[in-house]
Amino acid sequence: MLKVYYTFGCPNCGGPIDDEHLLAGVPCSKCLPGRVENLDYRVIYDLLVKNSTLKGYAEYFYDNETFEEIVRIFKRVIGNEPWNLQKYWIKRLAKSESFSLSAPTGLGKTTTLLVYSLFFSNTTLYVVPTNSLKDQICERLRNMGAKVSCNDVKEEYINVATFNRILRHYDNYVSLQPKLVIVDDSDMILKSGKTTEVMAKILGISEEIFQYAISLIRLKRILKFNEDDKELKNKIVELEYKIGSWKPFVQFLVASATLRPKGIKQQALRTLIGFEPSTIQTYLRNIADLYYQGVDIEAILDKISDNGGLLLVSKEYGREKMLELKEIIEKRGYSTGLAISGRKFLNKFTEGKIDYLIGSASYYGVAVRGLDEPKRLKYVIFYGIPKIRLNLTDALNNPSLIVKIGELLNIDVKDIRRKLLFLSPPEFQILRYSLMKDEELSGKLKDIKVNLINIKEKIWDVLKSDNIKKLKADTFLVTENNGKYYVYIPDTVTYIQASGRSSRIISNGLTFGISIVLVDNIDLLDILSQKLKKIIPNFMFKNINEVDIRELKSLAVSSREVSTSQKKKINIKTILLIVESPTKAKTIARLFGRPSRREVHGIPVYETIILVNDEILITNIIATKGHITDLTTENIGYYGVEVGNNEFNAYYSPIYKCYNCGKTFTIKSNTCPYCGSVFISSSEKVVSALRKLSTEVDEIYIASDPDQEGEKIAYDVAMLISPYNKNIYRIKYHEITRNGILNAILNKGKINMNLVKSQIVRRIEDRWIGFELSLALKSMFYERNHGSGRVQGPVLSWIVERTKEYKKNYGWILYIKLGDYAIKKFFRIKEEANKFIEKLNIKINLISERKEIQNPLPPFTTDSLLMDAYDKLGIGSQIVMKIAQDLFESGLITYHRTDSTHVSALGISIAKEYLESKNLNDSFSGRSWGNEGTHEAIRPTSSMDTESLIKDIEDNPNKYFIKFTKYHLRIYDLIFRRFIASQMKPAEVTYSKFEIFINGEKLEVELPTKISGGFSIIYPLKTYVVSEKYSTYLTKGSIIPLFTYAEIIKNMKEKEIGRPSTYAKTISALIRHGYVVESKRKALLIATNKGIKAYEFLSSCCSDLISENRTKLLLQKIDKIANGDVNVDYVLEDLHKEITQISGKLVNSLKLDTNV
């Protein structure tokens, strides 16, 4: 029977524990002897106390008890149960965690914080932006029975103060030494470095630690320019260790924010508090988005015939236009007020003394950001498209804009576009700053700047000479006004934030609002609409003249009544989404808005909002960075597996990684066993973070990769967090897109245990065989860097045998080029070749021609991508897999480890959309190719070709979290074209048969010479032009060619001894051990003397173990385990017998060699 043990997994003592105990949610048998069963956490605690074995479980128990106590106080003072989102916050508060409460107004942030400050019963500082809010908070706290001080500074009290008062009485508030600090609006403390320093001192952060954090930020910025600077990296690690040893003793809570910390001191504070004050999330929206052609405010007033509106004037019109509109509205019998500063206007609006508020359409303006009146505010009217206006002269200091405008004017910018694309973000910022300030640069940046200035001059020349009045791009508009040019960019953030003022929360329901845009430029409306569609699902502007405004008004009014079915009900759930890579975590978080970020045990966690039907998922996303456990190398059993009485107990340890040498190991040690460094990280940190987060949320979705390795990662995660949360689901996606993630969540399931067992067997087999062979090789050759495995063995044998044949048949190769077709001839000695060349006579006859209808190739699988990338681009398999991983994690292609050619209906529709956009509708021929299975073929996730991708990178520089290289673009282009071609009609190919006479020797060849129509438009095949005009090239070489990456991968697939996930790894392992090297020019694979000796030794003593047939049979058994067709115990028993027998042979072989 196979059982998994985790050497560090017990939730109480931190020692070994089996998966059965973890699944039941109870500590190990040492801590809690007896029958394994599900028990309430209170029962577990009592039993541990009774057995005198209580350790780490106490913290979990007290956190739960604290949560329950806060909920009891909440019910007592508020009169009802906390909402789901409030419970999520309370769970985090109960752990004394510092964090930012991210939610729109109306979801109970302030109520939760007031109740918590009441519970806290210790010196508290509650910071608010205004005196009116201070008075409201004080009154509510007094009504709850709290000890409140609203003017004087008092210990053991809740001190409520404005930040301005704190600045005036700075020393008093620092000496107060509060244990809890609550900030209503973090913008106050992030305005400047000085205000940030004030808050740091109130939070008890010493000057020394604050300076360490500032130094850390500076060094990390420098590292972006010197990524390979090892000394700099070590300094960063040292500072991180120093900062990590500091523990905050003040709990810090932030209720809302709109600014991101940008200054170095603000970022230093963020580093120390462990979270980023998050922006207001705009996930709650129940709005009719309307537009009216023109800026006739009176026409809109006639249509609405109602009060309760906010009129926002586009910034370029200024205050004068606001006053003009105020007068017009008042003449129609409505009272108005200017929402420009202060808060008095809001009170009058709430009381019904003002019908319409008028303000500026500015994101940071009080009318957009500070207005919250859910009952009265029904309409938001935009006078003009909300926009950002830039003088073109200033705008052309942005390199990306120079390129985009140059392209619109048909100026050649291709070369500079490519150069900009491959700049790092810091390099790009330096270039932009230099253009702005006209500062000197050097090196490649100097050349790029000169080119950009030349393009700027051409732009001005074309604009003036052609008298151009308007230029429309995808994301902006350039217009001429009185001889001056301006760039207009629709302000999507302001539109979302401002229109959202009309749809707020009342009694756990969302009111209905109406947003109306008075259109002053139809082109800008179109750009705004397209940008909003990318942010808000199913967004659409509707013409106000084409909707029933009376019905919409009625809905807006009824949704504001206390009890109504017209309100959109709010269903909120909190989830933890666990992925493998940090890039993937960031990409998914960004798909659903602008996420907030915090750190849990030093691990980044992104909080975002995912809307699934009518459910709002408050989603925390964290990355495991791959496997979190591996078979232990501690002295346990047979290489980490206890074997006996038909039982196999596999012990898994955390994975340790050395910061200095980069190597990983699974034996507990305070220093690196390879280089001795003390700077070591452990996956235990990740596990601790996962466990902490799992206690906070309703459900957990494990979204590791959809393959055997990903399933084992999912299993390990599920086991290690089971004691803390039972609502664990496995979700799988094959593309990182919005739809891909949503479909995965809607189809959440359970972990595939057969797949997990197959991975465990594969890992045990790899360990047993690998360690036995490596031990023998190291003993035989007295060198540490030796190793082998069952799959590596056959592959090494192929390369060794081919290398031997290559050397045996070495001589001279003559290439005779006939047009673009080449013929090879082999000669043993150079003189023979030269004689042949001297009398060279060539005659070519065209014998016949035939036409053939040829179907396109299917889209790529892993092996075909690796082969084509090498054959067409000369890129090795390891690099291709890394690039494919980047493209997948960036949401650009589907999962890249696949042996399926199947294309889904969505994939087919992407190809159709692309071909239609290129007016190639007639060439479309949708194909699903292979049968539907677990995976799909490798394909793009959208109809964006390479040129469009480049534009997307330029337009959205913060969208992707990888650094694109020319190789990324080439691989993407290869995948894109191959896929599109697979969905096109066949091409017509002309094959020509030639009779070639070379010095009288006859040779017949048939070659493709023409191709037309169908898929060849996108993915042309190689054709040949054969000519009697020839050229020759003589070089040293062999008649037997060396293996290429592509040929090895093809062999592995055909002989069934590899999997998509192991093709590249197998070759790289052989290179790492020094058994194989790559030739520099063509990346051909050559066996070294070391590799030949290792192969000869292994084949002499254990040829069966590394034979193709045995390897194939074992992999087939592992596949059968994955399909549930074979009992895992039988496979392990057979494997153990085989290995122990071979182990004996190896020992005897080594003895014989020693005796000799």
Swiss-Prot record:
<protein>
    <recommendedName>
        <fullName>Reverse gyrase 1</fullName>
        <ecNumber>5.6.2.-</ecNumber>
    </recommendedName>
</protein>
<feature type="binding site">
    <location>
        <position position="675"/>
    </location>
    <ligand>
        <name>Zn(2+) 2</name>
    </ligand>
</feature>
<dbReference type="InterPro" id="IPR005736">
    <property type="entry name" value="Reverse_gyrase"/>
</dbReference>
<dbReference type="GO" id="GO:0160097">
    <property type="term" value="F:reverse gyrase activity"/>
</dbReference>
<dbReference type="GO" id="GO:0016887">
    <property type="term" value="F:ATP hydrolysis activity"/>
</dbReference>
<keyword id="KW-0963">Cytoplasm</keyword>
<dbReference type="InterPro" id="IPR003601">
    <property type="entry name" value="Topo_IA_2"/>
</dbReference>
<feature type="binding site">
    <location>
        <begin position="103"/>
        <end position="110"/>
    </location>
    <ligand>
        <name>ATP</name>
    </ligand>
</feature>
<dbReference type="GO" id="GO:0003677">
    <property type="term" value="F:DNA binding"/>
</dbReference>
<feature type="binding site">
    <location>
        <position position="580"/>
    </location>
    <ligand>
        <name>Mg(2+)</name>
    </ligand>
</feature>
<comment type="function">
    <text>Modifies the topological state of DNA by introducing positive supercoils in an ATP-dependent process, increasing the linking number in steps of +1. Binds to single-stranded DNA, transiently cleaves and then rejoins the ends, introducing a positive supercoil in the process. The scissile phosphodiester is attacked by the catalytic tyrosine of the enzyme, resulting in the formation of a DNA-(5'-phosphotyrosyl)-enzyme intermediate. Probably involved in rewinding DNA strands in regions of the chromosome that have opened up to allow replication, transcription, DNA repair and/or for DNA protection.</text>
</comment>
<feature type="active site" description="O-(5'-phospho-DNA)-tyrosine intermediate">
    <location>
        <position position="895"/>
    </location>
</feature>
<keyword id="KW-0238">DNA-binding</keyword>
<keyword id="KW-0460">Magnesium</keyword>
<feature type="binding site">
    <location>
        <position position="672"/>
    </location>
    <ligand>
        <name>Zn(2+) 2</name>
    </ligand>
</feature>
<feature type="short sequence motif" description="DEAD box">
    <location>
        <begin position="184"/>
        <end position="187"/>
    </location>
</feature>
<feature type="zinc finger region" description="RG C-terminal-type">
    <location>
        <begin position="655"/>
        <end position="682"/>
    </location>
</feature>
<dbReference type="Pfam" id="PF17915">
    <property type="entry name" value="zf_Rg"/>
</dbReference>
<dbReference type="InterPro" id="IPR023405">
    <property type="entry name" value="Topo_IA_core_domain"/>
</dbReference>
<dbReference type="InterPro" id="IPR013497">
    <property type="entry name" value="Topo_IA_cen"/>
</dbReference>
<keyword id="KW-0413">Isomerase</keyword>
<dbReference type="Pfam" id="PF00270">
    <property type="entry name" value="DEAD"/>
</dbReference>
<comment type="subunit">
    <text>Monomer.</text>
</comment>
<feature type="binding site">
    <location>
        <position position="31"/>
    </location>
    <ligand>
        <name>Zn(2+) 1</name>
    </ligand>
</feature>
<dbReference type="GO" id="GO:0005737">
    <property type="term" value="C:cytoplasm"/>
</dbReference>
<feature type="binding site">
    <location>
        <position position="28"/>
    </location>
    <ligand>
        <name>Zn(2+) 1</name>
    </ligand>
</feature>
<keyword id="KW-0799">Topoisomerase</keyword>
<keyword id="KW-0547">Nucleotide-binding</keyword>
<dbReference type="InterPro" id="IPR014001">
    <property type="entry name" value="Helicase_ATP-bd"/>
</dbReference>
<feature type="region of interest" description="Topoisomerase I">
    <location>
        <begin position="570"/>
        <end position="1156"/>
    </location>
</feature>
<feature type="binding site">
    <location>
        <position position="705"/>
    </location>
    <ligand>
        <name>Mg(2+)</name>
    </ligand>
</feature>
<dbReference type="InterPro" id="IPR027417">
    <property type="entry name" value="P-loop_NTPase"/>
</dbReference>
<feature type="binding site">
    <location>
        <position position="13"/>
    </location>
    <ligand>
        <name>Zn(2+) 1</name>
    </ligand>
</feature>
<dbReference type="InterPro" id="IPR013824">
    <property type="entry name" value="Topo_IA_cen_sub1"/>
</dbReference>
<dbReference type="InterPro" id="IPR040569">
    <property type="entry name" value="Znf_Rg"/>
</dbReference>
<keyword id="KW-0067">ATP-binding</keyword>
<dbReference type="GO" id="GO:0003918">
    <property type="term" value="F:DNA topoisomerase type II (double strand cut, ATP-hydrolyzing) activity"/>
</dbReference>
<dbReference type="InterPro" id="IPR013826">
    <property type="entry name" value="Topo_IA_cen_sub3"/>
</dbReference>
<feature type="domain" description="Helicase ATP-binding">
    <location>
        <begin position="90"/>
        <end position="277"/>
    </location>
</feature>
<dbReference type="InterPro" id="IPR011545">
    <property type="entry name" value="DEAD/DEAH_box_helicase_dom"/>
</dbReference>
<dbReference type="GO" id="GO:0005524">
    <property type="term" value="F:ATP binding"/>
</dbReference>
<feature type="domain" description="Toprim">
    <location>
        <begin position="574"/>
        <end position="736"/>
    </location>
</feature>
